[in-house]
Amino acid sequence: MTMSFVRKDRPTIVGMLRSTTADLLVAEIDRMLQQGVDAFGFQHEIVQADERNEENYKKIFSAMQGKPAYITNYVRCNVLDLTDEQLTEELFLLVKLGAKLVDLRCDLFDRQPDEYSTDPVAIEKQKKLIDQLHAMGVEVLMSAHVLKYTPYERVLEIALAQQARGVDVVKIVTEANSEQELAENFKISLALQEQIKMPVLFLCNGTHCRKHRIFAPLLDNGLYLAGEYGGPGVNQPTIQEAKEQLQLAGYNDLP
């Protein structure tokens, strides 16, 4: 299928929503539209349990005014204790109501500490799910939140495994807790572009992650996952910071 969520001409600015109720999400979306974003990231796992209903979802997607939505429904940070089958059911509802890029964990149906499963049964179920989502006209991102510094060889192994499962975007999150680890992560960002034949979202958390979060999207023409505001403990750049970097790099067609 033709890739549409990730831009080919420059990094895509994705406004990552952090609110937990429908009314607050609509207000946050409106503010982000005024700041200028290409798309939205709807982190469904943090939405309050009593706010999870079709009426609210329709209101949220409508507020995006036609901008595409990337949706996550992780186990981590989820306010409910749900099985992977239940999490998947919620994703299908969100797709029917307007989501365009769906995030599936790389350990879906076989939970692992680093979110990377090699279980053949789980992988086959993942592939069938990916085919179902493609048939619904949406794109699929597969994520592995390793959440520790990870050498290139291991990152490449995970990325190739994700690619082989039939997704449209590869996502891996590690850490950088020293200048050396930060430098290695920049090298990994560049190396993945030569080995992976699809958009790659390689991110890191940790004490030294900010430079990578700000500059790596310019190296791999990837996604800027950006927030409305920054502050202590916030790894993601703000929307304004992302746009400033793109302007400095010579991009003028910004939202």
Which sequence ranges carry the predicted segments?
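Active-site beta->alpha loop and helix N-cap motifs at the rims of alpha/beta catalytic domains
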Residues: 7-135, 139-152
